[in-house]
Amino acid sequence: GLDINTNTLISDVLGPMGSFNTTMAAHTGIGMLPILYYGTEEHKKKYLPKLGSGEWKAAYCLTEPSSGSDALAAKTVAHLTEDGAFYEITGQKMWISNAGFADVFIVFAQVGGDKFSCFLVEQGTEGLSLGAEEDKLGIKGSSTRQVFFENVKVHKSALLGEVGKGHLIAFNVLNVGRLKLGVMALGAAKRNFDVAVKYANERKQFKQSISNFGAIQYKLAEQTIQMYACEAALYRTSMLLQQKAQSLHDNGMSFAEAKLEAAEEYAVECAMLK
C-alpha cells in the first residue's frame, strides 16, 4: 500500500472533485479499512481484492436517525439465532454514502442490547433494502440513501472484530479519515482560489481588471495565507503520522496496528485540522 503522505497528496489532488471524491473516499477509507484492519484472513481474501480493484464498492453504515455524534446509542440490533450460527440484524441507517451501488456494507449494531459490534452484510441479502436518494444541496453525483435491515440474517463469521468491540472499529477508522477530510477541503479551496484569481483578472470595472484594486488583492492575499497555513499544518501532521506508524512497524507491530495507533495518537490534531 501507499504511505500516509502519498495518500494525503492524493486526497489533496482529488479535493476539487466533489462527488467523485466523496464516493472514492467513502469506498477506500471507511468502507475498506475496517476489513483491512479488523477482518480475518478469510475476510481479507474474500473482499479486499474485489474492493481494491473497484469490482465491488463498499459503504459504511454507522449513523441512525436518533444517533449521529452519539454513535454508541445506535438502536440497530443483532440477535444470535438459537442454533448460534447466525445473527439477525434489524434497524435503520441514514445518510449512507455509496449505499445506492454498494456491494458490501459495514454495519454497526447492538448485540445483546448493549454490545456495540460490527458486521459485514452483502447487497442482495434478504431483508436489506434502500431508501430513495437524498435530495442534497451539493455532491449530487454521490449516492446517499437510508439503509433498512429487517431480520437480515448473516453468518456469525460476518462479525468484524469481537462482540462489544465495535466502537474500536468505528472510531479508529474515523480517526484515520479525519486528516483526509481536512486535506480534501484544502484541495477544494485551492481550486476555488484558482477560479477567483481567474475571475478577478477577467472582470473589468472602471476600465481595468478588478484584481488591480486593493480590496480584491487583500482578499486574495488572505486566502493565500490561510491555504498556506492549512497546507503546512496538514502535511506536517501527515508526516508525524507516517513517522509514528513506521517507527511502530519497525519495532515489530503489524502495519494495521501501527497505523491505527499512530492515528489514535494524533486524532485530536487531525480533528482540529478537519
Describe each region flagged by the PLM.
Residues K46, P65, A73-H79, M94:
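Beta-sandwich/jelly-roll carbohydrate-recognition scaffolds of carbohydrate-active enzymes
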Residues S66-S69, W95-N98, Q110, K136-S143:
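Short Gly/Pro-enriched turn/cap motifs at secondary-structure boundaries
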Residues G54-L62:
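A short, Trp-centered hydrophobic/proline-enriched beta-strand micro-motif
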Residues N151-I169:
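Long, acidic (Asp/Glu-rich), low-complexity accessory segments flanking structured domains
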Residues A85-L130:
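A short core secondary-structure module
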Residues G1-A26, Y38-G39, H43, K50-E55, ...:
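Alpha-helical interface subdomain recognition
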Residues A73, E126-H155:
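Flexible, small-/acidic-enriched active-site or ligand-binding loops
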Residues L2-I4, D70-L72, N98-A102, K140-S142, ...:
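Short glycine/proline-enriched turns and hinge-like loops at secondary-structure junctions
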